[in-house]
UniProtKB/Swiss-Prot annotation:
Pfam families: Glyco_hydro_32C, Glyco_hydro_32N. Belongs to the glycosyl hydrolase 32 family. Its EC number is 3.2.1.80. 6-fructan exohydrolase that can use phlein, levan, neokestose, levanbiose, 6-kestose, and 1-kestose as substrates. Its main location: secreted. This is Beta-fructofuranosidase, insoluble isoenzyme CWINV3. It catalyses: Hydrolysis of terminal, non-reducing (2->1)- and (2->6)-linked beta-D-fructofuranose residues in fructans. InterPro entries: ConA-like_dom_sf, Fructan_Metab_Enzymes, Glyco_hydro_32, Glyco_hydro_32_AS, Glyco_hydro_32_C, Glyco_hydro_32_N, Glyco_hydro_beta-prop_sf. The active site is at D53. One of its GO terms (cellular component) is apoplast. Keywords: Apoplast, Cell wall, Disulfide bond, Glycoprotein, Glycosidase, Hydrolase, Secreted, Signal. The keyword Transmembrane does not apply. It is an enzyme of class 3 (hydrolase).
Length: 594
């Protein structure tokens, strides 16, 4: 069979997606028949079994790739984890591929754990990943594609040089705490750099730095890229540059140039949250220094203040943007996951960039979500009176995209925030919708049942504090995602999440965007300054029985400047149909030369 050119590939892929959409519709009906109300319509998930960390997202020859930690044996985590693999042309519709690789050699025989993809200067993708070796220690391995002409990269090979990075008595690295290599970056000296997460016995978190000229032979640097005491294990580190102007992304090897800051993200195993700092990378000393006010610990800002972990970014060189993925775990007991046959989602992919202040990252659903939009409802200039609730009719409330902008006029009516109120999640947990204040709670009720016995509320409260130095009133915006009434099933984790939003309501409107998808609610406050993701499992507010409301339970009225809500169509997510066959190169022997 002749190799397909780019146009033939595109035609074959369109045909495959058409057929796969038909298959997916049948599968969706089957899921409903099998009582699967919590499977999502447009969030990434395998057809079955367990999924956790996103691994090695990239774009290659016009095809987006997502690898992920996958247990092919069941709906709970298993040490024999493999690299699942799916591909897409738009980051919305996905085709399942065979696993990229499985435990198969001494350096990964007990599991192929998380890692990243690096695109070499010649365009060849290379995977660095953590393997659990025959001694159950953590080591770093490499995998390369068998056929670089295949845009779907369906076959990968493990060179005999594995493992490339190990622990020993000399380097003193704990073999149980040495994992998750990042995307590598190329220095001006021609050497590659990569960091691996670790920690010491006294809970110092580390980003261990390695260097290589050929991507095979790696040498540990004398000093880590960065460390912080009393933080515990740093999982899934991510280190990438961001532009100080505009929202365009920056290629990972763009280091030390004018107009660039760096972000170091770590996933702290002790809290199961993702924290980031913004700072400077000294390319001569190979150290990262957070900006003043940032510390790489629990005081750092989080990418998401809800159910969100092990995130990973990649640079999309086609659309000049950096895209963020994150694992969204279940909030249901394991027995429920086993019964339904699957566990774990990925957040909808987000564009991520540096705010113009240089002090925080902004996140927003990628623009491709708009291709799923259907029926639309628009409101303009409505008043939400104190204690009022308005229903939003005309959209599929269980699968929707909602944007609303609020304006508060009488800010002086805000309650005073106490100096001891420093924990936003605690404030949200103690002050549910029944606790009225001057300004708030106001926001959205999503996945609400007809009798309001079930609902998930995403809302704001505004407080004021007096600045004794300048004798000026400051306002504090609190964003909450309250799952306490989300389900009649009390076996679920129905924690309430909360965070402060860095906006000034005296000069700015208060905006909220919420993506609703059956069992996941992703919310973006203040234009993406604060993100909160939750998992919910209603018993009543399912499918057509789900409702959407806007509410104001405060004592003062709030203006809705605009509200736009869209029904979202289902995407094709990992149907059984594979990508079109492409004839392999004459030699099937992998080329291990970089």
């Amino acid at each position: 069979m002749a190799k397909l050119n780019r146009s033939n590939i595109g035609l074959s892929l369109l045909l495959s997606m058409f057929l796969a959409n038909f298959i997916t519709d049948l599968e969706a009906s089957s899921h409903q028949d099998l009582n699967q109300p919590y499977r999502t319509g447009y969030h990434f998930q395998p057809l079955k079994n367990w999924m956790n960390d996103p691994n090695g997202p990239m774009i290659y020859k016009g095809i987006y790739h997502l690898f992920y930690q996958y247990n092919p044996y069941g709906a709970v985590w298993d040490v024999r984890i493999v690299w699942g693999h799916s591909t897409s042309v738009d980051l919305v519709n996905w085709i399942s591929q065979p696993p990229a690789f499985n435990p198969s050699q001494p350096s990964d025989i007990n599991g192929c754990w998380s890692g990243s993809v690096t695109i070499l200067p010649n365009g060849k993708p290379v995977i660095l990943y953590t393997g659990i070796d025959q001694n159950k220690g953590q080591v770093q391995n490499v995998a390369v594609p068998v056929n670089i002409s295949d845009p779907y990269l369906r076959e990968w090979s493990k060179p005999p040089q594995n493992p490339l990075m190990t622990t020993n008595a000399v380097n003193g690295i704990n073999p149980d705490r040495f994992r998750d290599p990042t995307t590598a970056w190329l220095g001006r000296d021609g050497e590659w750099r990569v960091i691996v997460g670790s920690s010491t016995d006294d809970r110092r978190g580390l980003a261990i730095l390695y260097k290589s000229r050929d991507f095979f032979n790696w040498t540990q640097s004398m000093k880590p890229l960065h460390y912080e005491d009393l933080t515990g294990m740093w999982e899934c580190p991510d280190f990438f540059p961001v532009s100080i102007t505009g929202s365009d992304g920056v290629e990972t090897s763009s280091v030390g140039e004018n107009g660039i800051k760096h972000v170091l993200k770590v996933s702290l195993i002790e809290t199961l949250h993702d924290y980031y700092t913004i700072g400077s990378y000294d390319r001569e000393k190979d150290v990262y220094v957070p900006d003043l006010g940032f510390v790489q610990n629990e005081s750092a800002p989080r990418l998401d203040y809800g159910k969100y972990y092990a995130s990973k970014t990649f640079y999309d060189d086609v659309k000049k943007r950096r895209i963020l993925w994150g694992w969204v775990n279940e909030s249901s007991p394991a027995k429920d996951d086993i019964e339904k046959g699957w566990s774990g989602l990925q957040s909808f992919p987000r564009k991520i960039w540096l705010d113009e202040s240089g002090k925080e990252l902004l996140q927003w659903p990628i623009e491709e979500i708009e291709t799923l939009r259907g029926q639309q409802v628009n409101w303009q200039k409505k008043v939400l009176k104190a204690g009022s609730t308005l229903q939003v009719h005309g959209v599929t409330a269980a699968q929707a995209d909602v944007e609303v902008s609020f304006k508060v006029k009488e800010l002086e009516k805000a309650d005073v925030i106490e100096p001891s109120w420093t924990d936003p999640q605690k404030i949200c947990s103690q002050g549910d919708l029944s606790v009225m204040s001057g300004l708030g709670p106001f926001g959205l009720m999503v996945l609400a049942s007809n009798d309001m016995e079930e609902y998930t509320s995403v809302y704001f409260r505004i407080f004021k504090s007096n600045d004794d130095t300048n004798k000026k009133t400051k306002y504090v915006v609190l964003m909450c995602s309250d799952q306490s009434r989300s389900s009649l099933n009390d076996e679920n984790d129905k924690s309430t999440f909360g965070a402060f939003v860095a906006i000034d309501p005296s000069h700015q409107t208060i905006s909220l965007r919420t993506l609703i998808d059956h069992s996941i609610v992703e919310s973006y406050g203040g234009g993406g300054r604060t993100c909160i993701t939750s998992r919910v499992y209603p018993k009543l507010a399912i499918g057509e029985n789900a409702n959407l409301f806007v509410f104001n339970k405060g004592t003062q009225s709030v203006d809705i400047l605009t509200l736009s809500a869209w029904s979202l169509k289902s995407a094709q997510i990992n149907g059984d149909l594979m990508s079109p066959f492409i004839e392999r190169e004459e030699s099937r022997s992998p080329n291990h030369q970089f």
